[in-house]
C-alpha cells in the first residue's frame, strides 16, 4: 500500500473510514460500492446505447454488484482480525476501484469493456483473503 492510499480514497469517497475500525466496516463497504456504482450508472446513461451486448451485460452486472452487499465479503469482515497489512491491502484495492471508477466517468463506449473487467477483478481481489 502506498502511504497515501487512505487519503486518496477519503478525498474522493465521503465517509470512507478504511477497515481498521470494526464498527465502520459495513459503512466503508457501502460508501465505496456507492461511489463505484454511481460512476457506472453515469456511464450507462452516457454511452449505454453505444455498448455492444457483452459490455452492456457486464456493466449491468457490476451496477447490480454495487447495489447489494457481497455477503461472503461482509461475513468475513464481521469476523476477521484485520491486522495493519491486511487493512492496507484492502485500502489499496479500494484505491484501485476508485481510480477505475474515475476513469469510467470519461470513457467512451469502446474503452469501457476493459475498464469494467478491471473493476470486476478488483472486486474479486477484495475477496482473496476470505478462507476457501
Feature locations, PLM:
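Charged linear interaction tracts used for macromolecular binding and regulation
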Residues: 45-129
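Leu/Val/Ala/Ile-rich N-terminal alpha-helices, chiefly Sec-type signal peptides and the beginnings
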Residues: 1-48
Amino acid at each position: 500500500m502506498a502511504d497515501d492510499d487512505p487519503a486518496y480514497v477519503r478525498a474522493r469517497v465521503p465517509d470512507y473510514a478504511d477497515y481498521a475500525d470494526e464498527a465502520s466496516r459495513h459503512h466503508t463497504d457501502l460508501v465505496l460500492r456507492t461511489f463505484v456504482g454511481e460512476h457506472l450508472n453515469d456511464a450507462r446513461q452516457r454511452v449505454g446505447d453505444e455498448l455492444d451486448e457483452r459490455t452492456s451485460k457486464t456493466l449491468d452486472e457490476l451496477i447490480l454488484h454495487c447495489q447489494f452487499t457481497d455477503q461472503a465479503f461482509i461475513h468475513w469482515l464481521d469476523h476477521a482480525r484485520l491486522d495493519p497489512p491486511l487493512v492496507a491491502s484492502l485500502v489499496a484495492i479500494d484505491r484501485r476501484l476508485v481510480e477505475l471508477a474515475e476513469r469510467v466517468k470519461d470513457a467512451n463506449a469502446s474503452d469501457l469493456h476493459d475498464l469494467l473487467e478491471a473493476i470486476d477483478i478488483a472486486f474479486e481481489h477484495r475477496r482473496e483473503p476470505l478462507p476457501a
